[in-house]
């Protein structure tokens, strides 16, 4: 068996598919061997959306979905390997993020729940699985998120450069790499794609706003934007993390109650500006200038990138592709790396980012045997 091949599995708050990557860590920079995205069937997508909000019969629904999502993740792995020509015996382990259905780290007894049973993944792939990466950090008083800044630091930091790595998935998060390893920071800025995707799904039955064209056709309503930006989360100091628990369609409906006169495209534009303004405000608290590298689905949204650049004139803005990592796969590669860290017995959280009391080895191993 190779000792350097790992698989990473990621499905984020957008729930737009399971990203699977096969990565070779035998070189200084991770080498991407193969990629695959497994679509989430409509019935699973709807079930997951329901489970993200309090409701009836939650425990039974969670139990069923846990197994079903595990099988879906296993299917993603098997299809990835089939397309790569690599035998499962060559893979050391799978790093599975799972699907977050509740993230509540700030309660008196904080918790986070990711489903996608790793036992099922191990049984259906024949490969050891390392999963449950977030709860150790929460047990140590942390947010359990974001976890990718440690990976960003490992592969993107440069001693003489001030860099921001911006991941725009359903939720947006930033990693501040000021060139001094001791000063690395990271946190969730707020909604990324979750509200803009949700709105266009509702009014246009489209999965997402391609290139931001629908938003570009509208005009931002500054009164609504100011109301959205008044959410207490944006005033919270870091460390902080968030999810669909705060920013979801039900919250948006409440916010729109007095704005029924607005055109649908104007709302789309306003929601895009909510994402851009909340990101820019947090970046400007850290620095007025530097290099900004975007990854995640938001990197493909041309209008979003243009608006961000306008709000951050002191930054050169591009994607992680110029650093050698395709922006679509950064998070999935990060979970392959988290599996590698667990396998090596090395810590993978950054207490300055999550607020945990100390560094820790993250995750638990679920053997295929």
Swiss-Prot record:
It is an enzyme of class 2 (transferase). SUPFAM superfamilies: Actin-like ATPase domain (SSF53067). GO terms for molecular function: ATP binding; kinase activity; phosphotransferase activity, alcohol group as acceptor. It catalyses: 1,6-anhydro-N-acetyl-beta-muramate + ATP + H2O = N-acetyl-D-muramate 6-phosphate + ADP + H(+). The gene is anmK. Belongs to the anhydro-N-acetylmuramic acid kinase family. ATP binds at residues 12-19. This is Anhydro-N-acetylmuramic acid kinase. Pathway: Amino-sugar metabolism; 1,6-anhydro-N-acetylmuramate degradation; Cell wall biogenesis; peptidoglycan recycling. The lineage of its organism: Bacteria, Pseudomonadati, Pseudomonadota, Gammaproteobacteria, Alteromonadales. Keywords: ATP-binding, Carbohydrate metabolism, Kinase, Nucleotide-binding, Transferase. PANTHER family: ANHYDRO-N-ACETYLMURAMIC ACID KINASE (PTHR30605:SF0). It comes from Shewanella amazonensis (strain ATCC BAA-1098 / SB2B). It comes from the Bacteria. GO terms for biological process: 1,6-anhydro-N-acetyl-beta-muramic acid catabolic process; amino sugar metabolic process; peptidoglycan turnover. HAMAP family: AnhMurNAc_kinase. Its EC number is 2.7.1.170.
